[in-house]
Amino acid sequence: MTIKVKLAAIAKDEAAYIPQWIHHHAAFGFQEIEIWLNNTTDNSIELLQDIQSKHPEISIKFKMADEFLERCLSQNLQFQQGAYSEIYKSTFETSDFSHILFLDLDEFWTPQDFTTTIADFISSSPDADAISFQWLIDTPDTYKHIFSPPFSHLNKLQKNRHVKTVVKLTNRMTELSVHNHIIKDGEFILADGTQFPGTDQETLNKSLVPIAFQKINGMRPDKAFVLHQINRTPVEYLSSLLRGRGHKNDQRVFKANRIGYILDNQSAPAMD
């Protein structure tokens, strides 16, 4: 099997982060990037068109998904999972991609050695249907410059139980979700190649690793991970709150799934 990996996301008013997100993942071997924009008021469209024009070597697709969003909300359906399902179905039926990964624009798939490509990583576990990578959450830093690159020479990160999952394109796919997916007779592993531990009840269908596993491995770096830039800088953190969660049919002005510009007390202690 030829390994060919696609990356996909939904995004709202994230033009400031689109270039670094695209180039980061293109550098690690993702061969196509697709973004569905919703409720966008910034220059994301123009920016994506500019990147397409100046970087034809990167396959970039984007779509204005407002109509699809409204349809989901009117039917009380999850827009994010619906978008993922549409992208998955289309990619499976019309392309030769073998795998797909769904991330947000504040998430960066990263190999620890900063060299291994996503295809090379997958090739070490060719029989796996799904490979899950734990979040490493950035820590608050009031001295950090606004719009700093996602990585520097010194990175203090907290390992979180949540995962993001690269998955095979297969007709055995039963349900797509945000953190992991349900595949009939699927083989689910972690970044270290071991079987995904715990019961589906404890791990919420493999969306997060078990508590006992985290206690043992919370301070151990993985061969690959997903950097989750929840915090960035104070200004950026406050700005992110204003994007709300309209795609979840949550009409509140602010994001309600954030705890403040503080260390995450649900994650392991920060490590360099």
Describe each model-derived feature in a short phrase.
Residues 1-23:
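N-proximal low-complexity "stem/linker" segments adjacent to membrane-targeting elements
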Residues 6-8, 32-34, 59-61:
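A structural signal for isolated positions on well-ordered beta-strands in alpha/beta enzyme cores
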Residues 23-32:
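Short, acidic, metal-binding catalytic loop of nucleotide-sugar glycosyltransferases
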Residues 31, 98, 129:
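Short acidic/polar active-site loop segments enriched in Thr and Asp
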Residues 37-53, 66-69:
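A conserved acidic beta->alpha catalytic loop
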Residues 52-99:
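Active-site-proximal specificity loops/subdomain of glycosyltransferases
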Residues 77-82, 111-272:
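Catalytic-site signature of metal-activated, phosphate-bearing donor transferases
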Residues 97-108:
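Short beta-strand-to-loop acidic/aromatic patch adjacent to the donor-nucleotide binding site
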